[in-house]
Amino acid sequence: MARDGEIERIMETVIKPTKNGITTNLILYGDSGTGKTVTMRYLAREIRDPQVVYVNAIAYRYVKNVLIDFLSKFGIIVPERSSYASLFTRIEGLLRNQGKNVILVIDEAANILKGDYDGLYYLFRSKDSFDVNISTIFVVMEDPAILFDAKIRKSYGIFSEIKFRRYTKGEIYQIVMNRAVQSLTGEGYDEDVLDYIAEVSAEYGSARVGIDILAKAAHIAEYRRSPKISFDDVRAARSMISPFVTESKLASMDYEDLMVLLSICRCLSASRFTDVDCISRNLSVISEQYGKKDINLYDRIKRLENNGIISSSIEGQGRGEGVKKVISIYDIPVSVLTEKIENLLSA
């Protein structure tokens, strides 16, 4: 999960005050796949006092729906047309019997925050209006500044905000590693492949994307009857999530770009990354094969990078050895791309 810092802030902002009888309100926000939901489910499972109750509100438009769902988790069934007064009366009795305070987590809360101003007012003023001491944590993707204007903020009162930043490559690697240990046999993957999944997923900053690529790559390897996930399985999985290199994009490329791209593919046939030396060697062979010489390799590589076809990074070569540029393709299996390029060059 890699969210220890965020959990500590939630503990200090909401959980500890609520345990001491102080009502607080918090909004968690951040991009999809940044661990908001899994963090709140973890806290709902692990924290006993105060009690943390999780409700997914993606299908709800009103706070009233959330409160009815909340009560149902304790076996209390109420009519959908219940008034706020009757709902909070039932909640007040529940909390009295429980003998501890409650934090209500409302996930996928954007629709409610954008539209149910009356319901939110009742929820935020529940202590004053109904003597119900209930703290709330809203989970959304949008920045609260987009959801609330100054007038609405003043009406609702003070609440805190915590942004869940995007995961780093290292954090995604740890999450993917944990999932691989849980879900796959030890012979089904190696650390280089998991690191490559983290590399491919890092542009999204999303653990969800990394886990999805791992699952799809494992299925692809199984379909090939391979005992181990390959780099090309990862590329195939990535292309299933968000295809970028399409046939129309390839068809629009000029002859020399295709030749350089084919050289890169041949270097990557069994590798995660390649370098300019390997590409240059392969380009010499391909140039001879297709009768095209004097290609400016560096300009062509730069064009492919600018068009998003290839990705590159700078890697150190060890103490005193300097650095070099390494190149990879994330968005399509190089075996498939090789075949498509060869067909275009031969047409």
UniProtKB/Swiss-Prot annotation:
Transmembrane segments: none
Keyword Metal-binding appears in the UniProt entry: no
Residue ranges the record marks as coiled coil: none
N-terminal signal peptide: none
Domain of life from the UniProt record: Archaea
Database matches in SMART domains: AAA
Sites where the protein binds ATP: T34, G35, K36, T37, V38, Y167, R179
GO biological process: DNA replication
Family annotation (Gene3D superfamilies): 1.10.8.60, P-loop containing nucleotide triphosphate hydrolases, Winged helix-like DNA-binding domain superfamily/Winged helix DNA-binding domain
InterPro entries hit by this protein: AAA+_ATPase, AAA_22, Cdc6_lid, ORC1/CDC6, P-loop_NTPase, WH-like_DNA-bd_sf
Keywords noted in UniProt: ATP-binding, DNA replication, Nucleotide-binding
Pfam name, any one: AAA_22
Annotated GO MF terms: ATP binding; ATP hydrolysis activity
PANTHER family, sorted: CELL DIVISION CONTROL PROTEIN 6-RELATED, ORC1-TYPE DNA REPLICATION PROTEIN 2
Function (record text): Involved in regulation of DNA replication. Has no effect on MCM helicase activity, either stimulatory or inhibitory. Does not bind DNA.
Protein family per UniProt: Belongs to the CDC6/cdc18 family.
This protein's name: Putative ORC1-type DNA replication protein 1
